């Protein structure tokens, strides 16, 4: 028979476990301290980098996106406060505040024909038209950052993804799965017809018409019934290039 460890053996084992635990805690603390020191060094280097390349960050969209990525990697948010160090150094807070105001204006001006749902690409095109005289170009990444800041206003602005498109919603319309599937189908031509939706999604005509009627009521769709085949086209400005130029000069 194997002899069980005595009291002395148990005490030695417990002491060894305590030593390993203390050693592990010391190693973890050392690693944490080293990481904090490295992050502090990175932040200092990032501040110096920002001072040196201030104009590039403001004027060059690609450079600005890379700068934001660098900040995110070390937990720095240049947009966290308009009165913060980064906002004062770069004026980034003002840039995104002005962009946010322009986004609201574009969404309001185009709401009558898209129902408050506009593709991110179209929104950027409108903004570029408005800012042609400015030297600060605007990218989709800039728009996404500005919209994320609008959420604090409780204004209902939200970015949703349907199929391959990102859409900006500026009204509190709730889209269900059926609505999203129809919008995804419409991305091909900008419109759908009832029979096509029935065939592609294996739905009943009642289900298709019910979903389309809701989208019409919300102002997200438009009916075109002037075709020789007698089939109504349900157009969706938010995914149709046909309507992308509407309001661009406003």
Curated annotation (Swiss-Prot):
SUPFAM superfamilies: Winged helix' DNA-binding domain. GO terms for biological process: multivesicular body sorting pathway; protein transport. Residues 35-55 form a coiled coil. Signal peptide: none annotated. The keyword Metal-binding does not apply. It is found in: Endosome. Pfam families: EAP30. GO terms for cellular component: ESCRT II complex. Keywords: Coiled coil, Endosome, Protein transport, Transport. The keyword Protein transport applies. InterPro entries: ESCRT-2_cplx_Snf8 (IPR016689), Snf8/Vps36 (IPR040608), WH-like_DNA-bd_sf (IPR036388), WH_DNA-bd_sf (IPR036390). Gene3D superfamilies: 6.10.140.180, Winged helix-like DNA-binding domain superfamily/Winged helix DNA-binding domain. Belongs to the SNF8 family. Component of the endosomal sorting complex required for transport II (ESCRT-II), which is required for multivesicular body (MVB) formation and sorting of endosomal cargo proteins into MVBs. The ESCRT-II complex is probably involved in the recruitment of the ESCRT-III complex. Component of the endosomal sorting complex required for transport II (ESCRT-II), composed of VPS22, VPS25 and VPS36. This is Vacuolar protein sorting-associated protein 22 homolog 1. The lineage of its organism: Eukaryota, Viridiplantae, Streptophyta, Embryophyta, Tracheophyta. The gene is VP22-1.
